[in-house]
Amino acid sequence: MSERTHWRDYLALTKPGVVMLLMVTAVAGMFLATEPAGMVPLATFIPAFVGLSLAMMASAAINQIMDQKIDAIMKRTEKRPLVAGKLTPKAAITFAVLLATASMIMLYFLVNPLTAWLTLFGFVGYAFIYTLYLKRATPQNIVIGGIAGAIPPLLGWTAVTGEAHPYAWLLVLIIFVWTPPHFWALAIHRRDEYAKADIPMLPVTHGIPFTRESVLYYTILLFICTLLPYLTGMSDLIYLLSALILGLVFLYHAVRLRFSEDPKLPMKTFGYSITYLFALFTALLVDHYLPVTPANVASWLGA
């Protein structure tokens, strides 16, 4: 190592920003699994939160271990701790194994076996199947591998209930459909870097115009999917209004990206997609604890 190892290097290895966003969806899954206005018992919440966080941190660390050569080529990732020589591969592997082991033990024995097994599925899917194979094999890498990154709300739900309810799978569907426009917007901006690293991202294999169209199509599909929680009775009017507003803004970004050559638009779309997902799941939680139904509105209006 060229520099003294610092705890921040281990933290950077776990992609804390990504883990934080995923944990927002996992925590949302926990609380949405309760009865309206119900709370998650601390005896469940604490081990589930810690266990899921450790699993996501471990998978992110393994992703960086596997992608070390690729990260060294790309400007966006060239300062990551392994590439910069701040951590040795051996130290990183040991750290990742410890995180993963602690996660599985905690989830299996302190939460429930179903959550542990589903977490293991997501861990293997992202850290190994996506990182080692799909990312390097097909431009549909993030579509096929998206299921692994979309399951946190399901994990949160099963941690509380011990079952994979259809509503939990609906949350998975939303993140699954959100993933392509989110990543492809970034891939458009970083197209040359992916090409240099020989990663077959969609802008590299099919061109930027095709990718712009794909972002728009998936954003339209996402808009439709986000209406399902209301249409199925899972959520009420606060969520519906939020989903409509957030979705229309996302569509605005996607349409501009499709028809404009402004080089700033891909990253603006990428940035908004993160805000969008955070706000959408926040709206789900607010709606769960402050339900506003058409009947409520009619009563308030004196109808």
Swiss-Prot record:
UniProt function note: Converts heme B (protoheme IX) to heme O by substitution of the vinyl group on carbon 2 of heme B porphyrin ring with a hydroxyethyl farnesyl side group.
Top-level EC class: transferase
Locations listed in the record: Cell inner membrane
Catalytic reaction list: heme b + (2E,6E)-farnesyl diphosphate + H2O = Fe(II)-heme o + diphosphate
Pathway connected to this protein: Porphyrin-containing compound metabolism; heme O biosynthesis; heme O from protoheme: step 1/1
Main location: membrane
InterPro entries named in the record: Protohaem_IX_farnesylTrfase, UbiA_prenyltransferase, UbiA_prenylTrfase_CS, UbiA_sf
GO molecular function terms listed in the Swiss-Prot or TrEMBL record: protoheme IX farnesyltransferase activity
Pfam families: UbiA
Lineage top rank: taxon: Bacteria
Gene symbol of the encoding locus: cyoE
Family according to the record: Belongs to the UbiA prenyltransferase family. Protoheme IX farnesyltransferase subfamily.
Protein name in the entry: Protoheme IX farnesyltransferase
Any further remark recorded for this protein: Carbon 2 of the heme B porphyrin ring is defined according to the Fischer nomenclature.
Membrane spanning residue stretches: 17-37, 42-62, 91-111, 114-134, 142-162, 168-188, 208-228, 231-251, 270-290
Gene Ontology, cellular component aspect: plasma membrane
Membrane topology term: Multi-pass membrane protein
CDD domains named in the record: PT_UbiA_Cox10
Keyword terms: Cell inner membrane, Cell membrane, Heme biosynthesis, Membrane, Transferase, Transmembrane, Transmembrane helix
GO biological process terms held by the UniProt record: heme O biosynthetic process
E.C. no: 2.5.1.141
